[in-house]
């Protein structure tokens, strides 16, 4: 895969102005067609083995459907990680031994991650096929949720809860008010995290009220 131009330009700006690039890559393993290239991979391709000013964050919450595990890691510029480790030592909460053992098992296994991707492909295909004519569904390139444009996000979320017992999150709750308005307003986050059979039931209920 060729190196994307955007991170190369961003790294050049980081060198010029000395700012840190913190890349949230917790969704990086939930792709559909081709795996994305990560920030540290870009650094390596550029010959930047010190990963200067670059750090990445990974988590089990998305790749393994384990948001409650609170297990993840940060990697990158050692000069940044040293003070971060000290901060984490004094301000972070240690995982129990049981959680650490479960985390090791999850990090060492890729089979369930591949199955996870397969399941999300099937769920998105289900929604596109069954609801594409009823809702403005735009399939993302990766991830597990739709960012759906609606007339009023709070009213739409309330309608789905009252009429179909389906919970979605109003987009305005994910952002803040600015002088230009709320960027999440009139969008809803529709996450396909339930299993395929439950998603089929969701589709059935949505078709009944839309």
Predicted feature residues:
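PLP-dependent class I/II
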Residues: 1-210
């Amino acid at each position: 895969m060729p190196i994307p131009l955007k991170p190369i330009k961003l790294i050049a700006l980081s060198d010029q102005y000395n700012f840190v690039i913190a890349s949230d890559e917790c969704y990086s393993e939930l792709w559909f067609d081709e795996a994305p290239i990560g920030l540290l991979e870009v650094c390596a391709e550029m010959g930047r083995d010190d990963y200067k000013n670059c750090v990445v964050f990974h988590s089990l919450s998305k790749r393994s459907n384990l948001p409650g595990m609170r297990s993840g890691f940060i990697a990158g510029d050692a000069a940044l990680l040293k003070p971060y480790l000290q901060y984490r030592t004094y301000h972070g909460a240690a995982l129990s031994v049981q959680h650490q053992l479960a985390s090791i098992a999850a990090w060492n296994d890729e089979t369930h991650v591949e199955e996870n991707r397969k399941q999300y492909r099937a769920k998105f295909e289900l929604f596109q096929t069954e609801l594409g004519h009823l809702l403005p569904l735009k399939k993302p390139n990766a991830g597990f949720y739709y960012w759906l444009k609606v007339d009023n996000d709070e009213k739409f979320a309330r309608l789905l809860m009252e009429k179909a017992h389906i919970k979605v999150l109003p987009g305005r709750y994910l952002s803040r008010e600015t002088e230009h308005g709320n960027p999440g307003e009139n969008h809803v986050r529709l996450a396909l995290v339930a299993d395929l059979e439950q998603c089929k039931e969701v589709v059935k209920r949505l078709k009944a009220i839309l």
